[in-house]
Amino acid sequence: MAAKRPPASTLKWCQQEMGPICEGIGMVVRSQIGYDGRRIEKQIRRKALQTVVMGGQDVDPLKEPNKTNAPLLSPTLPSTNEALQRARVVAAGIETFAKLMSQGTYPGSAGFTVSETGERKYMKQTSPVQSNIVANLMATADKLSKGVISLAPFPLPTITKLGTWVIANPTAQLPIPPQLKSAIPAIGQIETLIQSILGVQGPVSSVSRAPRKLKLEGVTDQVVLEPETIHATVDVEPIDKTLTKEEAEFLIKAARSVDDDNAETAIFGTQKAKPKVYRPELPKNFEVNLEMGNVHTLTRSNESSVPATRIGRLATFGQLAFGLLGGATAEVTRRTFGIGKRLQEEGIPKNPFLSEANADRIVATLCRVRGAALKLGQMLSIQDSSTVPPALLQIFERVRQSADFMPIKQVHRQMKDAFGDDWREKFEHFDDKPFACASIGQVHKAVLKDGRNVAVKVQYPGVAEGIDSDIDNLVSVLSVGGIFPKGMFLDAFVGVARRELKQECDYEREARAMKKFRELIADWQDVYVPEVIDELSSSRVLTTELVYGKPVDACVEEPQVVRDYIAGKFIELCLKEIFLWRFMQTDPNWSNFFLGKHPKTGEPRLVLLDFGASRAYGKKFVDIYMNIIKSAYDGDKKKIIEYSREIGFLTGYETSVMEDAHVESVMIMGETLASNHPYNFANQDVTMRIQKLIPVMLEHRLTSPPEEIYSLHRKLSGCYLLAAKLKATVSCGGLFHEIHENYVFGEDGIDINID
C-alpha cells in the first residue's frame, strides 16, 4: 500500500476528491429511505441522520438558493468553523451507514412497498459486509468529525447514495463490493442536484477523477473506476425531477430540523407533489364472516338484577373493597411462603391487589353494577399497555366484552315506563333475552309490524341517577393499593366519563346524533349508519334497524387488504369528523364499529353504532388544531409552539424542557400524518415514545389542555391502536393532505348542534 501523500493545498485536494466524496457520502439517504431506516437507533435516526441527509445543511444553502452563482468549485473556501460543522454532520451519517452495513442492510435491500391492491413486496436481504470495511468507515467518521479530513468547499444538500468509500490515502483507489456496484449513481446527476439547490445556471465545470488504487483486505471482485470527465447542464426547474419522492420528503424534514423554512419550495417549486393515497378495496365477492366475532349472541354474560338504588350500588362497591383487601392479604401470604405460582413467572403481576382472584372480583362487580363504573372500565380497556399495566388491561378487556343482563322483569318495567302497558302490541315479536350488553343498556332483537328487523336498546335502571357516585366509588376502591399508575391522566378519564355518561343516558339526544351522521355519510359508499325508529324511541329506549356484523377488533384474522381497508376507513372517518364536519362520535370502543352487512343489499360495510358520546367542536378550535397538525406535517417546531399557545396547550411561560417535550409529543403523533407513503402500524411505537415524555410534561405543565382535547385525542388514540392491533398499513399522510387541501379557515356558520 502506498504511503499517504498530503495534498499540496486544501483547495487542490478538494477539487481532486469532489467526485468520490459526492459518491461516497451520497448513499446515506438511500440507506435510510423507506422502512429499513426505522430499524436503526432512534436517536441517530431522529437527530444526526435527519441532519446528515442535508449533507452539511448547517451552512443553510436552501435559505438563500440564489446566493451562490459561482462555479461549482469556488476558489473561496468556507470558514474553518463552517467546514467543521459540516464535517461533523457528514461524520454522523457515515457512522450510521457503517452500522447499517454491519447488519447487512444496504440501500433498497430492506423494507417493503405496498401495491394499490394491498400486496406487500419485500426486498431481498444481504449478508453483513466485512468487518474491516465497517471499521474503516468508523475511522473515517472519527477523522471527519475532528477536522483531520477536509470536505469539499461547497454544501452537499442532496446525497443520494453511499458506498464503502474509505479515505485512507489521497491517491488510493476506491474499492466497491459487488453487492454495492449497481447502487452507485452518475456523478453528473449529483452535480446537477447540487447546482439546482445552489441556484447556479449554466454548465458545470468539468471534473476529472484520477484512478485510485487502494485495495482493502477481505474484499474481492473490486471495481476500478476509470478516469472520466463529466459535463452537466443545470436546469432552473425544481429538483424534484431528479429526486425520488422519499428522498425529497426526507430532505425537507432534515432542512426544517435546522430551521430552514424554504426547503419545500426549493425542492418542489411552488407546487408540492401530491402524495398518492393507498385506498385498499375489499376483494371481489368478499363476504363478511360472522362466525367469528358476531356479537348477536351472548356467550360470556349472566342474568343478574341491576342495583337500582344508590344504597344498593354503594353496598356492592363496599363488598368489592373488602374483597380486594382480603384477596391482597391472601396473595401476600402465598408469596411469602412460596405457595402457588412464583412471582417470577411470566404474566404474574407484582401488585398483590391485581391477583387472579381480585381480577375476578373486579370483573364480576363491574359487570353487575354496569353504568358509570363499567363505562370507565371499557374506556380504560382500549388504552395501550405502555399506559395501563398489562394485568389491569386484561381485567378491563374482560369487562369490555362482558356485562350481565337484566332479568326479564326489569326489562319489561323499563319498556312499560317508556311506551305504556301495551308496549308489546307495538312489535310483531320481541326477544326477551338480549343479544348484546353495553355499559348503560342492553340490546334486544325485535320485529316490527311491517316485518323490519330492529335492535331495541333498553337502559339499565338507576344508571342515570348514579353516575357521579358510581365513578367516585370505583376510583376510590381501585386507588387502594396503588393500582392506577402515576401519570395515567386518571382525572381526565374520570372527567370525560362523567360528561359522556350524562349525555349517553339521554337516548333522545343520541337519536338526533345518529340522524345527523346518516346525513353526513349519505354519499359515502363504504360506511353505514342504521336508521332510527322514532315511534319506538324515548329517553330510556332507542330502537334502530338491525345490522349484522362483527366488531372491528375481531377482524385480526382477516386478509391484509381487508385489515388495511378497515383501519383506513376508520382513520379517514376520524379526519372527516374533526376537520370536515366538526362533529365526532368520540367513544372509540371497538364494539361500536362493525365490519357488517348492509341491511338491504347485504354488501359489506363499515357500520357505525352507539352515538351517545357524539359532540361538536367550534370552528376556531378546529382551525388552530388544523394549524398544529399541519405544522407537525411540515416538521415546523416553531409553528407548533405558536399555535399550541394560541389553543391553550401552553401559556408562554413554560420552561424550554416543557416546550421541547410538548413539541416532541406533537411531532411523534404527527409522524403518521407526515408520511407521504403508507404508514405501517405493525411496527408503530408512538404510544411508547409519548409515554416517556409524560413525566416531564406532568412536572412542568402550567395549564391543563383544552377541554375539547380529552375526547378528541381519545378518539385519535383509538384509531391508532385499532390500526396497530390489525397490523394495518394506512395512507395517513395522503388522507390528511386531501383534507387540508380543501380546508377553509374562518367561521362558516355551519356548526352542528344536537343539544
UniProtKB/Swiss-Prot annotation:
Major localization class: mitochondrion
Mind listing the UniProt keywords for this protein, alphabetically? ATP-binding, Kinase, Mitochondrion, Nucleotide-binding, Transferase, Transit peptide, Ubiquinone biosynthesis
Catalytic residues identified in the record: D587
**What InterPro entries does the database record attribute to this sequence?**
ABC1_dom (IPR004147), ADCK3_dom (IPR034646), Atypical_kinase_ADCK (IPR051409), Kinase-like_dom_sf (IPR011009)
GO cellular component terms, A-Z: mitochondrion
Entry's Gene Ontology BP terms: ubiquinone biosynthetic process
Q: In which pathway does it act?
A: Cofactor biosynthesis; ubiquinone biosynthesis
Quick one: where's region Disordered?
Answer: 57-78
Q: Does the keyword Ribonucleoprotein apply?
A: no
Q: What is its EC number?
A: 2.7.-.-
Enumerate the subcellular locations listed in this protein's record, separating them with semicolons: Mitochondrion
Polar residues bias: where? 67-78
Q: Which GO terms describe its molecular function?
A: ATP binding; transferase activity
Task: Give the residues the record marks as binding ATP.
Answer: F435, A436, C437, A438, S439, I440, G441, Q442, V443, K457
Is Isomerase among this UniProt entry's keywords?
A: no
Record Pfam families:
ABC1
As for family, the record states: Belongs to the protein kinase superfamily. ADCK protein kinase family.
Matching PANTHER family: COENZYME Q8, PTHR43851
Q: What is the protein's name according to its record?
A: Atypical kinase coq-8, mitochondrial
Gene source species = Caenorhabditis elegans
